[in-house]
Amino acid sequence: MSKIIEGLKYSETHEWVKIEGGIAIIGVTDFAQKEMGDITYVDMPAEEDEVNAGEEFGALESVKASSDLICPVSGEVCEVNAELEDSPELINSDPYANWIIKVKISDESELDALMDAAAYAAQIGE
């Protein structure tokens, strides 16, 4: 079974979101990293880039596949996880500790479209 954290929000495209004071911390779920296999590269936006809910903001590459990252919220990228540039495999070791980007949310109502832990577990059949 995949690890799913209570208190986070989840997208249908397997990104998780943690909200801290108007900032969305975004990463990929345990389910996603297991499906991808060993992650070898993370493509991330630059700080201060604008991102939009439902649109691509980067990609993960693994030995098995490449997968677009879809942003669950709109806003301005305020931080990227630079550790992932040299060590993308950190996502495999702990996808919830190793976030990808932080976004200053421009429309908090977009969070309503995301799933809670129970709904996400049902979506992935766990």
Q: Residue ranges of each PLM-predicted region?
A:
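Acidic, low-complexity mobile loops and tails
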Residues: 1-56, 93-126
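Structured functional modules or segments
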Residues: 44-96, 105
